[in-house]
């Protein structure tokens, strides 16, 4: 109860602040809890600071999880559009606890070395094909949840990333058809244990990327039609208020369409699947000397039009 209360207070406080990048005011789908509701619900985050529209109250036949919502495609999206246009009563921020917009997806696909300026930071060549790895779904937490430092690592680092959420099943998808399989976009924090990436576990990346709480997502799934150009968005990360990463998604080596086409050669995409598209320069490990997260730090990951997620390190 204390944790939920702290999350609701943080939600209310951050909504009162002015952030550098203004979020889209269109379709912003969220998963949330509220004290008077049983279990998670689907909602629409309003862009004017008003709160959250409860989609399940608007139409009780709607599913209560984002994955099930996306599986039904246009039928459920049309209900959400009607709710947005209806100017319904909203739940105030102070009563809402935001969950990750997608929880327990079939897969979380991650991409390494996918920003030109991040490659320059490391003095390495730009990859000729996408570098793919994964996180377990159990690493996903909400946009304002805490990141827990694991005792197994002394080198936990930050990474702000644009996340793509799949809305339509597919395999062997052509790049020209890829955006038809995208539901929308959200902000991700790809928390990374550098010692486990570079010196442990045979230098395989999985364990260092997938500790519990190592994948905060949110605050909303912004539908693709609400984002003018996902490959021209300002992206930044702040640690304790200091800007540590600042770039633009136009620096991505492989764009959303290329990543979907590449990965779908190997696996089937399902609604709710998440693709973390890589991070820009400014991570702690490449600073001189290296800097890593410590207890008490606060990390803010923000992307233009999508919003900001804030995670305290404990």
From Swiss-Prot:
Cofactor note as given: Requires a divalent metal cation for activity.
Residues reported in the UniProt entry to bind Mg(2+): 159, 161, 190
Organism domain of life: Eukaryota
Annotated coiled-coil segments of the chain: none
GO MF annotation list: metal ion binding; oxaloacetate tautomerase activity
Location in or out of the cell: Mitochondrion
A Pfam family it matches: FAA_hydrolase
Cofactor: Mg(2+); Mn(2+)
GO biological process: oxaloacetate metabolic process
GO CC terms, sorted: mitochondrion
Enzyme Commission identifier(s): 5.3.2.2
Class in the EC hierarchy, top level: isomerase
Broad class of where this protein is predominantly found: mitochondrion
Key words, A-Z: Isomerase, Magnesium, Metal-binding, Mitochondrion, Transit peptide
Residue range covered by the transit peptide: 1-84
Catalytic reaction(s) noted: oxaloacetate = enol-oxaloacetate
Annotated function: Tautomerase that converts enol-oxaloacetate, a strong inhibitor of succinate dehydrogenase, to the physiological keto form of oxaloacetate. It is thereby required to maximize aerobic respiration efficiency by preventing succinate dehydrogenase inhibition.
Family: Belongs to the FAH family.
Descriptive protein name: Oxaloacetate tautomerase FAHD2B, mitochondrial
Originating organism: Homo sapiens
């Amino acid at each position: 109860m204390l944790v939920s209360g702290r999350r609701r207070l943080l939600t209310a406080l951050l909504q009162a602040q002015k952030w550098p990048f203004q979020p889209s005011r269109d379709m912003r789908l969220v998963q949330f809890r509220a004290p008077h509701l049983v279990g998670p619900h689907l909602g629409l985050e309003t862009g004017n600071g008003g709160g959250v529209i409860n989609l399940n109250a608007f139409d009780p036949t709607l599913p209560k999880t984002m994955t099930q919502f996306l599986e039904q495609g246009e039928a459920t999206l049309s209900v959400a559009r009607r709710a947005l246009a209806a100017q319904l009563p909203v739940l105030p921020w102070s009563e809402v606890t935001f969950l990750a917009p997608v929880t327990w997806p079939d897969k979380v696909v991650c991409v390494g070395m996918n920003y030109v300026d991040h490659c320059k930071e490391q003095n390495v060549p730009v990859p000729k094909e996408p570098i793919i790895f994964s996180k377990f779904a159990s690493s996903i937490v909400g946009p304002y949840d805490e990141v827990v430092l694991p005792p197994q690592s002394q080198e936990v680092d930050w990474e702000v990333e644009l996340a793509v959420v799949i809305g339509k099943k597919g395999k062997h998808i052509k790049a020209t058809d890829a955006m038809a399989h995208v539901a929308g976009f959200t902000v991700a924090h790809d928390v990374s244990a550098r010692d486990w990436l570079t010196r442990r576990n045979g230098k395989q990346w999985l364990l260092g990327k997938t500790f519990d709480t190592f994948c905060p997502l949110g605050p909303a799934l912004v539908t693709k039609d609400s984002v003018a150009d996902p490959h021209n968005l300002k992206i930044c990360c702040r640690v304790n208020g200091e800007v540590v990463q600042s770039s633009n998604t136009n620096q991505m080596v492989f764009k959303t369409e290329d990543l979907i086409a590449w990965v779908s050669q190997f696996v089937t995409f399902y609604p709710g699947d998440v693709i973390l598209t890589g991070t820009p320069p400014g991570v702690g490990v490449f600073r001189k000397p290296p800097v890593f997260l410590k207890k008490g730090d606060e990390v803010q990951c923000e992307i233009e039009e999508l919003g900001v997620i804030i995670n305290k390190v404990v």
